[in-house]
């Protein structure tokens, strides 16, 4: 019998007998465990051989045998829990222990660095699973980061300085205002073993032509081996950066025929997905990666939803603290939480409603009514970026007849719930009921349901001149809520003729967007880890991090 199953049977037997020595029979014990008399004898003999109990069998009618426990069920449960942790079986651990608080403490004690069979393993605790990792779909902040570890693209944007770097393409050039040429590396392999071919690249870039930022791509062809030409309908100075974004990551052309591709995608990046369940995401270093092989062999993201109830539910990779080893990496996000007024509803489009609501739900009001732990993580926002002060809040008069408003945000985001509760209380003081809708991220991203206002958070990556417009333009919700000529805006941006500060100020001037809070991103980690540089998404590049060996 497998060790895990035997441990479960012992724990169950110990619980049924209250851990007490007793005189009993095989039949009575078999009834307790719902098994046959013969199987019960086998179980007792095996448990006795393990040193967990003694079984003094008596033969004869009416005679009772003595069962003595040498091991407690709690001790064995702890041992079983340790085994499950080492095997990364978090789902079974939750079932075994039951108490989420106890599971959390066990997980935290095993976070950080582990060295097993010559392999460096990093364990990370996170507050939600990541079911969808498919480029070109609606991806949240963490999914965006993980996709960058799994996939490669023609170019790569350096997370620390925003500079453009080679990836699948080793060089590129602008042949004419409407034609760019990229030169690709040969010999690149997908995680499932097949070699990358030009058809994979063409198919990947063709499939995203429906996205607003890629809609100006008119034709993609390969004039010679490992040479890719991209034809445009309008000039785009940002195209090389655009082709380094997650939607433009390269997929194998047969991806739609591969089972569960969204949760178990196959790319050419430094890490390959080994497991992705509601309790765990495990990625392994890809030995055949065409770049520098990752120094951390395995990254395990353990999922425990209950940690999201804490305000500082950022990335946690803090193991046992030894000699003041603990370190906290933090940065003020390049972005903010903001309110988005929906011009498709009468209340959302009404200028007086926008003015009054933005006054009542001002950043200072939200901060004042937040709990102290959150006040330490929040900073009032008066622009989309921390250094901008574009918002001009006014006093505003409450519009006559305003009795209710609808607010919508996406699920699995504790701070959204906290902000919504504060907003509800503030509006209730003025006899306005806030109807709150929590929906899936896909629904939120599409923005096709009715809502007066929407709650969102934006994290802009480097370079900001690129990502600020690119991020806002690629979310259908914003284009649905804000009536303006987005195509004309995109043409100006591509031509390098857009003043982004002025453009953002226009969005804030009519209260289409109302900044609320800048948030401190936090990584709780260990000083033994080197190369950890928090990016603007609140994560770090796994392949560049490494562990310093212990002192001799």
From Swiss-Prot:
Annotated GO biological processes are: negative regulation of DNA-templated transcription; peptide transport; positive regulation of DNA-templated transcription
Q: Which positions make up the DNA-binding region?
A: 26-49
**Keyword line:** Activator, DNA-binding, Repressor, Transcription, Transcription regulation
Q: Which InterPro entries match?
A: SBP_5, SBP_5_dom, SgrR_HTH_N, Tscrpt_reg_SgrR, WH_DNA-bd_sf
Q: What is the superkingdom listed in this entry's lineage?
A: Bacteria
The HTH marR-type domain covers 1-116
Q: Name one GO molecular function term.
A: DNA binding
**Region annotated Solute-binding, chain positions:** 163-493
**In UniProt terms, what function does this protein have?**
Activates the small RNA gene sgrS under glucose-phosphate stress conditions as well as yfdZ. Represses its own transcription under both stress and non-stress conditions. Might act as a sensor of the intracellular accumulation of phosphoglucose by binding these molecules in its C-terminal solute-binding domain.
**Entry's NCBIfam families?**
PRK13626.1 (NF010149)
**HAMAP family membership:** HTH_type_SgrR (MF_01449)
Protein name per the record: HTH-type transcriptional regulator SgrR
Q: Native species of this protein?
A: Salmonella choleraesuis (strain SC-B67)
Per UniProt, what is the name of the gene that codes for the protein in this document? Answer: sgrR
